[in-house]
Curated annotation (Swiss-Prot):
Molecular function in Gene Ontology: adenine binding; adenine phosphoribosyltransferase activity; AMP binding
Pathway: Purine metabolism; AMP biosynthesis via salvage pathway; AMP from adenine: step 1/1
Record's function text: Catalyzes a salvage reaction resulting in the formation of AMP, that is energically less costly than de novo synthesis.
InterPro entries reported for this sequence: Ade_phspho_trans, PRibTrfase_dom, PRTase-like, UPRTase/APRTase
Pfam families: Pribosyltran (PF00156)
SUPFAM superfamilies with a match to the protein in the record: PRTase-like (SSF53271)
Lineage, top ranks: Archaea, Nitrososphaerota, Candidatus Cenarchaeales, Candidatus Cenarchaeaceae, Candidatus Cenarchaeum
Protein name: Adenine phosphoribosyltransferase
UniProt KW Membrane keyword: no
Amino acid sequence: MDLEAMLASYPDFPKKGVLFKDIGPILRDPAALAWAADELLRRYPPADFDVIAGIESRGFILATIMSARSGKGMVMIRKPGKLPGKTVKLAYKTEYGEDILEAQHGSVKSGERVIICDDLLATGGTAAAAASLVEQVGGKVAGLAFIVELAKLCGADKIAGYNRKSLVVY
C-alpha cells in the first residue's frame, strides 16, 4: 500500500520552516491503518516482544491496533500529569525546549521486551526519551516502530543503538 501518497503536508506548521507530515488521511482509511499495523507486526513478529508501548498521542493509535492484533498488552507513555497512581518520569530536550514523559510504575515488568510506537520519527528526542524510560522501569527495548521517518532531521542518530522500522522515509 502506498502510504506516502496518502500523507498530507502542511508547510510552516507548527512553526515556520517545518513541513508537517500528517497521518490523518491514513487514520481515516481503515484499510490503510490496518495495513500499517499489520506491516509493522510483520517486521516485528509477536514472538519477538512482550508488550507494546505507545507514545502520546498518535502513537497510542498504532500501538492499540498492534496490541489487539498481536495479543500483547499495551502501555501508555504520556505527558506529565495524565496517568493515575505512581509514575516514573523522564525529562528530555526537544527542538522546542524541554519536556517530560511518564509511564505508570509497574506497567512494564523487569526484563519485558518492548516495542515502542509513534506516528513519526523527526529529531528523535521523544523516541530516545521513551526508550530510556522503558529501560529505566526495567524493560528492554525490542524496537521502535513509526509510520513516518523524516531522515533529514537525523532522528535515527539519537536511537542508533536500537532497532527501528519506519514504513515511509522522507
